[in-house]
């Protein structure tokens, strides 16, 4: 049967929500059941989990180009459907200089890269609700890594190979072209069988991204359908694709492919056996070099913490690694990148002057119940960080360009008298003795506390007295320094705490009312430097809609 005939039976392209292509079939998911009284014998109609699906066997008459044409038509409509959700709603929790979504749910940063004199950054977006469903990619650009401008909804879940989500991936700047690599996610049948493919897209002269379709269609041996988040690098005279993977034994591993042309990929092997049972899945791989050392970043899922306050299975890790002349990878020594509540799926980019800069998702996969959901949006990205390899460990520092948003420093005496900052967007530098407690974002009812437990040499971050609705409330970090040097970045509903010159970082969402802008220190009296933070340009397509 011709696709035109199937579309006519479906009631036209405007009645088609998805196109699927499972096992020699073509399936059109419909908004409404077709009005045709009798369907041909070779066409079936069924309701699958509340979605009407019209199916026919795929014949030689149906080409990939025809399927792509339907995908483009669906994408055009999907982009129009996001327009009402591109207006950012005013909210007391919305950051002034971090990237947040106008509405809906933001998660992983994607495609972070410097290309042709500009920085590009994408993020995962579900525009229509604060839930993880049918992911899109939003495209932002910047000249300075501080002010980001909305460009477009770059990719939508419109094609048979990504019908249930354009999952995470990275970008490649090759010659004059900007390529995107991502995981296409589809769900098939009443049991929602997952089908995973690695896909590519390329930016055209108009700044739009044209999908090239799947570049890896089949799973490597020994791996489940949980294989995703391609990172593509050029090394040893060839392209390599790194993928987070799950083995049939439900162990996380790194899958590696190679290619000569970015389009045809060949599987090499799985890496990571030296870590043993190190989580049931590895997500969001990144790979880079820093001061002559190679590093592998990933998100291992299913690692239990020895601390009873840490109950979240979604972890973050960076490992020092090596790759020999034959391309064999070994993972050596690893650490958490962030030890706060809300940090996942980081990506890095190299700046024009050679720095390695990181951006992460200030959220976690299971969190969908933040107070900002009452205003129709959830999650944000972290502040950008510069990475440094020094004295055998990774140090992280706030991006130096963020200094352009800072006011002149104000000396602030921290004591048990509450000082009203009258803002929740600031930077604070202070060195604290053991045995004291710093309270931030406080009023008479709410606060977040940083306790320096002298007896146990623990830095304890406690957000139990905030408006948090979901997630852990205490994080503890063992330190051995005689004092604790802090550099704190606050932005309305977030804290990023850089400890002892960036040796550790704790990133957290902190929800307190708009008037909770007090700060105090109990158990000591110390001078601090306070900087007020100015807003960055709003990373939205449409102006913020201020609610009365």
Swiss-Prot record:
It is found in: Cytoplasm. Pfam families: Glyco_hydro_32C, Glyco_hydro_32N. The active site is at 108. Keywords: Cytoplasm, Glycosidase, Hydrolase. It is an enzyme of class 3 (hydrolase). One of its GO terms (cellular component) is cytoplasm. Signal peptide: none annotated. Substrate binds at residues 105-108, 124, 167-168, 228-229, 283. It catalyses: Hydrolysis of terminal non-reducing beta-D-fructofuranoside residues in beta-D-fructofuranosides. GO terms for molecular function: beta-fructofuranosidase activity. Pathway: Glycan biosynthesis; sucrose metabolism. Its EC number is 3.2.1.26. GO terms for biological process: sucrose metabolic process. Its main location: cytoplasm. Enables the bacterium to metabolize sucrose as a sole carbon source. Belongs to the glycosyl hydrolase 32 family. This is Probable sucrose-6-phosphate hydrolase. It comes from Vibrio cholerae serotype O1 (strain ATCC 39315 / El Tor Inaba N16961).
């Amino acid at each position: 049967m011709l696709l035109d005939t199937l579309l006519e039976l479906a009631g036209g392209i405007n009645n088609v929500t998805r196109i699927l292509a499972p096992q020699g079939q073509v399936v059109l998911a419909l908004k409404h059941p077709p009005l045709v009284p009798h369907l041909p014998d070779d066409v079936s109609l069924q309701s699958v989990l509340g979605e009407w699906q019209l199916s026919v066997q795929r014949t030689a008459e149906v080409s990939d180009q025809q399927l792509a044409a339907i995908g483009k038509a669906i994408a055009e409509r999907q982009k129009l459907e996001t327009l009402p959700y591109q207006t950012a709603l005013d909210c007391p929790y919305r950051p002034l200089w971090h990237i947040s979504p106008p509405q809906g749910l933001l998660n992983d940063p994607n495609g972070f890269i410097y290309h042709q004199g500009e920085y590009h950054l994408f993020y995962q977006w579900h525009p229509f609700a604060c839930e993880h469903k049918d992911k899109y990619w939003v495209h932002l650009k910047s000249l300075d890594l501080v002010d980001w401008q909305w460009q477009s909804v770059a990719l939508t879940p419109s094609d048979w190979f990504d019908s249930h989500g354009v999952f995470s991936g990275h970008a490649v700047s090759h010659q004059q072209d900007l390529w995107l690599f991502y995981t296409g996610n589809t769900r098939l049948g009443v049991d929602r069988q997952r089908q995973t493919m690695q896909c590519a897209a390329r930016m055209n002269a108009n700044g739009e991204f044209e999908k090239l379709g799947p570049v890896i269609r089949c799973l490597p041996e020994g791996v489940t359908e949980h294989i995703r988040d391609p990172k593509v690098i050029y090394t040893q005279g060839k392209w390599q694709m790194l993928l987070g993977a799950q083995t049939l034994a439900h162990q996380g591993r790194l899958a590696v492919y190679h290619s000569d042309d970015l389009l045809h990929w060949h599987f090499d092997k799985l890496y990571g056996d030296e870590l043993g049972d190190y989580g049931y899945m590895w997500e969001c791989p990144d790979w880079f070099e820093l001061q002559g050392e190679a590093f592998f970043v990933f998100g291992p899922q299913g690692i239990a913490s020895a601390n009873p306050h840490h109950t979240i299975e979604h972890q973050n890790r960076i490992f020092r690694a090596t790759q020999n002349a034959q391309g064999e990878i070994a993972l050596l020594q690893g650490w958490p990148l962030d030890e706060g509540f809300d940090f996942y799926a980081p990506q890095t980019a190299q700046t024009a002057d050679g720095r390695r800069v990181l951006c992460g998702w200030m959220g976690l996969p299971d969190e969908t119940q933040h107070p900002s959901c009452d205003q129709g949006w959830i999650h944000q990205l972290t502040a950008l960080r510069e990475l440094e390899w020094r004295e055998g460990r990774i140090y992280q520092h706030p991006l130096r360009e963020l200094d352009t948003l800072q006011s002149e420093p104000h000396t602030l005496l921290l004591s048990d008298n509450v000082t009203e900052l009258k803002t929740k967007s600031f930077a604070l530098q202070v060195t604290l003795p053991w045995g004291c407690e710093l309270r931030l974002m406080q009023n008479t009812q709410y606060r977040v506390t940083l306790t320096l437990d002298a007896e146990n040499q623990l830095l304890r971050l406690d957000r139990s007295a905030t408006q948090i609705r979901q997630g852990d409330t205490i994080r503890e970090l063992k330190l051995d320094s005689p004092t604790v040097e802090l550099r704190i970045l606050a932005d309305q509903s977030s804290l990023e705490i850089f400890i002892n010159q960036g040796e550790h970082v704790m990133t957290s969402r902190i929800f307190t009312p708009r008037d909770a802008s007090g700060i105090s220190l109990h158990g000591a009296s110390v001078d601090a430097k306070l900087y007020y933070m100015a807003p960055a340009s709003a990373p939205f397509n449409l102006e913020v809609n201020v609610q009365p």
